[in-house]
Amino acid sequence: MTPLSPSAPLPRRGRRPPSPLDRQLPELLAPAGDRDKLAQAIHYGADAVYLGGSRYSLRANAGNFSDQELREAVMLAHGAGVRVYVALNIFAHQRDFAGLDDYLLFLREIAADGLIIADPGILAVARRVVPQMPIHLSTQANVTNPESAAFWQACGVSRINPARELSLTELAKMRERVTTELEIFVHGALCISYSGRCFLSLHLTGRDANRGDCAHPCRYRYRLEEERRPGQFFPIEEDDRGSYIFNAKDLCLLNRLPQLIRAGADALKIEGRMKSLFYVGTVVRLYRAALDFWRERCLDAPLPPEFAEELSKIGGRGQSENFFSGPPGPEDMQPGGAASNPDWAPAAIVREGGGSPLVEARNPFQKGETIEYLGQGLKNYPCRIIAIHDQNGRELERANPNSLLRLTLTTADNEPLDCRPPGLFRRQTMAPPTNPN
């Protein structure tokens, strides 16, 4: 039985008093594609977030932050004890260097905690202009071996996010070779190209994935056409929706976190700056709960069944451990291709807390329905909707998306409901199977 090595705990944002069993865990690093997603990541327990500004980021369509919004985001996160890393991870052309010095100085001024960089030229400028700022090497830099990691460490990099195509054994060897921090992707979408360096989008649509504008053609539905039979399309697999020959399952290393901790991972990263705020909140919540579970136990303790149940409510393209145990096989490709719709969908976001919360509806729901509030940890509160009122006090039978509403709720066991913004409510979209007996 291997306990966690003792150290000072990370900032906990007041969720509970420090426990004598607290141990240092890897940083839980969450995506923040916009202000609402940032708030979700903070609320549900991220230790740090990564986000992009209006320039230099590989997620041009993620919403991102203006300079003023970046300033506010850093202030909000720091007020909660959460670190902020700013992505500047495009593959830069000469024209991209105009204004880079000023932008780096701005990021230093607002006290960003680190810079995520892939391009050696941008890295060199950052080392010259803001030498005191930590530099995190992006996975797009394709660090696949210990000698490469040592090279980047010698260049002044303080953290490396290795290529996603490495096994646990390879990561452990890298850990032995370098002292720089290692940040490992543990959950989210996978790209079929080598650690995201893809030209398929540029070739098919003119949108350059390496400059933040990926059109995600790996998610398109493809059919095969033989040149002498124009108009006759043959599915590569017998599926009337076409074939998803490029479409990998999603990464999920939830049950492998103890091995990554033992191997020396310093940060565990969740992919998804372009995912929904519901995705960000539920995935961060799940991984936070898992880390806290092991914080108070030994790493050999198995996760209780409710973790698998919670994971099943998130949805996605199926789950894969990717290269964790070696090269993935055909079973790690998703033959049906499209992301599955989970049986649970977002219902509302809490805007004002309390027993009768003010919420922003995200999907329709109605009076008399049972929805579920997602507390911190994995505490879920099923609630029956007794009444719905709009901001003018009028009672409604049904909630429509994007409306602000006051809910009167009762929990199944009459337990007090401690709703806090920006907590999430979800609703079941598919009724569970009934027992025929």
Named regions from a protein language model:
Residues I117:
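N-terminal glycine-rich flavin-associated loop
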